[in-house]
């Protein structure tokens, strides 16, 4: 016995307590204490002045009994998952189970189900149930607990309890399987600290809380007009809410220590207390200095009396008296009394009923596979927790609705065939449709199921081929349907080789479609392309039927026939310079030409971005050796870029051209053809020709085009390029740039020259120091996929009209790296990139030929036209060089950039400077048949 009460853990009742309880006969009122606690022993009896033994350990489902002698009340304290200590124990168990991830939703559902089970037991074996709340407000989630308890009682317990209790001592509990409709009371352990603790204030709080609770219980049918059909009962005209306003149940030990410290620090001096006592001793009678007592304030006395009477015991005693007097259920709100349903049992009878109910509702649930003949009870044991998890069912139902809505949204919007991008967009729209309904913890699993169903629907004959084109557009044809030719559905507008006719081109999927087939097709529709003179580029000519593309190793992608590499020291450079001088005096043999050309085509790429300016020796002569310097250094060093037998000097901005001696011309005619080097007839170059590609490999088809579209007179610098001649140019961007080039002709010695040549034609070159002023018109044309064409007047500026053309404008174009891609100035929401597609050249009417050898640097490759002999352009003519539409290395496709920063236009590729040269006119050469031109036909020239 502790103080003035007994306490024990059910069912271990002490003998002496059992004897005392038996003496109560039929006047034992059982009060159940349930609710929340936040102390270590899970004790909710603090307001009653009771506590368990110090060695007590709280457990879920454990019941602690309290009995105060002299009363008729048996207090049954239920320890449940709503106690903070027990909830902490459950969390520790979940954390220790490392194999199962912690799920807060499942954990919360488990806590609630266990509490509902204990609440059901309390509602069946108690007359009064006191719900203890540690907060200052009513917890709305308690309404959910009452709803679940009512559902479980009506749908589960009432299906098997009446039958199973008939053969047990609990049969006296009648068909309702409980002692009565228990009266529910609410105990709030804390009162708002900022409110005055007077009778009026405390009563107001209690009345307001009673109104709130009553409305909630009535609204959710927890309390009805029929007490037998109600889960709980409420008293009529009696208080059922109690606020503990005057007693500090759980004092703050820290604050108490602070108060003790303050009292110690501010304790009055002991001498002052002794002096006060001496003064009081001199008084003639008691009360002379101060009155015997303070005057009594009636209001304060009333508050003190209210504080004395306002205890939880007095609050509970009034309801116990109703039970003992037999008017327990008659006092409920508007409820019809049900005679014979309220029972007061003696101690032994109650323990028998309690044992039966505890076994059925608590003990047996620990074994869900318990053998029983009652199917309803078996269903209760297996599915009780699942039936109470209504949120899970609710969320599952919402997710099912959202899943149906998402699938319908996906299927209704899905076309007959679509690609992965459309699939992702449709799936995103289906996800949004799902989220309009789907909620809760199961939403992620439902979304995964939605994605799986949509993906399966897409792959069921609706998936597109999605083979990427050379412009990175997927093929839109069905994947499962065989098709010989891919089609992305993207249409580009492009011009023909000569630029006169524009047409619609399908998105290319291979190099042949991009760089050859389209231009051959549109040439049949252009009345100019069929008439113009086309330069014939060298292509692969197979000798066997099973020819194939050349294979390139990953580690060594460059196939070289001869020695490669540039001189690494100064001595080697000097030796080569001597060799060049020797070659001027002697005729090169066929073997020397082959070795020299092979070596020159095997120059390694520079590792520095933008500095690989290896001018192909095939383009500028047989003995040219270039360093890996930048383009600016090459422009400033004329002696490294001129070919054998060429003299160049930068004197007064003039280019010096040394005219060939007649003897050398005759010797040149006897030289072998330019392509004397053997080329493969069984393997072809899969990509475009570049500076380090194998010299013996040729492409299957030409990717470049060089055509003479007419005489120079068809271009007027006053009007620019007319629409009927070159269509699609933007306004003001259709002008070529004039380029003035000063030449000084240096002739052979007079005697040797006059001995072999006579005639009027040579008279203007007879005198050394003859000067020529060449006017060349050059245009760098860019074209976007919408067919817009424009010229550029600088590497970073689009030509806006004749006012943009100045004297040095063309020099900025031909002597600088020109970007391969540039943003199109056309007004469009999308940023279309224009590509350098054509180079316009109007040659002068002079006794010289313009030589062109463009080189395009893209990535690690420097692409060339692939011609060993650089093309000579005829005099006084309009020539157009059409560049490749798509660039491809040995086995690597180089796609255009998706976006281009205008501040760094060269990142996508660029045209190297120094593509133009000038050479003496040779009437013996056929410019349109490069195969018949000698090896030195382009060797003697000066680079402009």
Curated annotation (Swiss-Prot):
Residues 568-589 have a biased composition (Acidic residues). One of its GO terms (biological process) is nuclear-transcribed mRNA catabolic process, nonsense-mediated decay. Residues 629-640 have a biased composition (Polar residues). Transmembrane segments: none annotated. Involved in nonsense-mediated decay (NMD) of mRNAs containing premature stop codons. Probable component of kinase complex containing nonC and recruited to stalled ribosomes. Residues 559-601, 629-654 are annotated as: Disordered. InterPro entries: SMG8-like. It comes from the Eukaryota. This is Nonsense-mediated mRNA decay factor SMG8. Residues 641-650 have a biased composition (Low complexity). Keywords: Nonsense-mediated mRNA decay. Belongs to the SMG8 family. PANTHER family: AMPLIFIED IN BREAST CANCER 2-RELATED (PTHR13091), NONSENSE-MEDIATED MRNA DECAY FACTOR SMG8 (PTHR13091:SF0).
